[in-house]
Amino acid sequence: MGQFISFMQEIPIFLQEALNIALVAVSLICIVKGLVNLYRCGLFQLMVFLVLAGRSCSEETFKIGMHTKFQEVSLSLSALLTNQSHELPMLCLANKTHLYLKSGRSSFKINIDSVTVLTRSEVNLTSINLTRSIDVFVHSPKLGSCFESDEEWVVAWWIEAIGHRWDQDPGLLCRNKTKTEGKLIQINISRADGNVHYGWRLKNGLDHIYRGREEPCFEGEQCLIKIQPEDWPTDCKADHTNTFRFLSRSQKSIAVGRTLKAFFSWSLTDPLGNEAPGGYCLEKWMLVASELKCFGNTAIAKCNQNHDSEFCDMLRLFDYNKNAIKTLNEETKTRVNVLSHTINALISDNLLMKNKIRELMSVPYCNYTRFWYVNHTLSGQHSLPRCWMIRNNSYLNSSEFRNEWILESDFLISEMLGKEYSERQGRTPITLVDICFWSTVFFTSTLFLHLIGFPTHEHIRGEGCPLPHRLNSMGGCRCGKYLPLKKPTIWHRRH
C-alpha cells in the first residue's frame, strides 16, 4: 500500500515531463523546421557573403570559427635587464670579433689576441699594500686590487662563467688599479704544452656565451684574454637570450626535473608591485603589451597539468624571480647568485635544450617572448598560450602553423562543451536524456538539407577558406590582399 501511494504521488511529475516533451516537439516542428531549415540550406549565408566579402582585408577579420579568433601575446624581459647596480649581466658580440660585457653602470670590452701586456711579478695580494705600482697575480675571485667594488663581482662572475676554477686553474694577472694606465686583467688561454686543456675549456666557454664569434687564436700559439673597462657600444642592444646563456653557463647546480609541488596562488599586481586579489595579470606587471587580457587561475590550472609548455615556463620564471628582482638593487651580490641559481633551475632543463637543438638544426624553436592563443569572444575563455616559433631569427607566419591553431580552436570548443555538459548534467540529469533525444530528432529532420542547398562562399580548390575575402577567376583576392595564384576556384557550402 505504501509503494502504491508513493507511485501515485509521482504521477504529476511524470505528467509534467511529458508536457514539456510535447512543448519541445511542437517548437521543433513549427519553428525549427521553418526557420532553421532555411538557414541550413545556405541561402542567407550566400547573400551575406556576396554583400560583405572583400570589404576588409585586415588580418583582424580572420576567424577560425563563429566565435574564435587567432590572437597573440608578446612578452618583454626588460624588467630583468634594467640599468641598475647589481643587475643581470648583458653580453654583446659586435662584428663577430668584439666581445662586450655590461652589468649595472659598468661595461667591459674583452680582447683576445697574442699581445702580452702584463707580466708576472713575485708579489701576491698580501704585500700589495707595500708595492702598489706592480701587477698583481691573483688566485681568488677577490679582485679588489684590480677593480672597484661595483666592477669586481661582475668580472669574477664572467671569469667563472667561461670555465675558470679558482682553486684548480692557473692564476690570473691584473694591473693594479692605482696605476695610471687603466684597469686590466689578463688570462692565458694558449692551447699549448701543459695549458692545452685549460685553454680548450675557456674557449668552449666563450663559444657558449658568445655564439657565432670568430676564433682569433690557433693551436700551439700564444693566446691571451684581456678584460678592461670601456663604454658600451651604441649598436649593442639588450638581448635576454645571451643573458640566459650566461646564467646557464655560470650555474653551480642543475635541477634534473621540474614539477609543480603544489597549486600556485597568483594575484594581480599594479606597476609598483602591490598585490591585489583576482588572478595573475602580466599586463599590470608591465611584461605584456598593453590592451591584452590577464591570464587568471584557469591558465595556471592548465599549467599544473601541462608541464612542457613554454608559456608556463615563463609564468614560473616571473613568479620565482619577482621578489628577487625587487630586492636585487638593495642587497649584496649574494642575492644575485641566488637569483642566478633560481633562474638556472628553471631554464636549464630539457625544454631549453630541445629548443637549442632545434636552433642549431634550423628547425623552428621557441625564444620565450611571443605566444599565441585562441580566444572565444562570447564567453571570454581562451586556450593555454603556446609559443610562437622562430626560424632563421624571424617569427613564423601564422599560415605556417595554421593546422595547430585550428586544432587548438577545436580543443577549446570541445573543452567548453564538455564543461557545459557536466554542469547541465549536475543541474538537470533527467532532462539531459530528453535533450539528447530531441537533438537526434532535430538532426534527422534536417538531414535532407545537406543534399539540397546553396553554396555559401568561394575559395581555391584544395586550399583553405579565404573568408572574408572574395576571389576572382585567377584565384586572387579582389581587394588585393593576395596575388593571383592562377588556380581554379570552387563554391562551397560551409567553411
UniProtKB/Swiss-Prot annotation:
N-myristoyl glycine lipid modification positions: G2
Cytoplasmic side stretches: 34-58, 456-495
Record's keyword terms, sorted: Disulfide bond, Fusion of virus membrane with host endosomal membrane, Fusion of virus membrane with host membrane, Glycoprotein, Host cell membrane, Host endoplasmic reticulum, Host Golgi apparatus, Host membrane, Host-virus interaction, Lipoprotein, Membrane, Metal-binding, Myristate, Transmembrane, Transmembrane helix, Viral attachment to host cell, Viral envelope protein, Viral penetration into host cytoplasm, Virion, Virus endocytosis by host, Virus entry into host cell, Zinc
Segments crossing the lipid bilayer: 18-33, 435-455
Keyword check for Glycoprotein: yes
InterPro entries xref list: Arena_glycoprot, Arena_glycoprot_zinc-bd
Residues bearing carbohydrate: N95, N188, N367, N375, N392, N397
Positions annotated to bind Zn(2+) 2: H457, H459, C465, H495
Binding site for Zn(2+) 1: C57, H469, C477, C479
GO molecular function (one): metal ion binding
Site feature Important for GP-C-mediated membrane fusion, where: K33
All ranges on the Extracellular side of the membrane: 2-17, 59-434
Residues marked Cleavage (site): S58, E59, K261, A262
GO biological-process terms attached to the record: fusion of virus membrane with host endosome membrane; receptor-mediated endocytosis of virus by host cell; virion attachment to host cell
Disulfide bonds: C92-C236, C281-C294, C303-C312, C366-C387
Cellular component, GO, one term: virion membrane
HAMAP family: ARENA_GPC
Family under the similarity heading: Belongs to the arenaviridae GPC protein family.
Protein name (Swiss-Prot/TrEMBL): Pre-glycoprotein polyprotein GP complex
Organism: Tacaribe virus (strain Franze-Fernandez)
Lineage: Viruses, Riboviria, Orthornavirae, Negarnaviricota, Polyploviricotina
Gene this protein is translated from: GPC
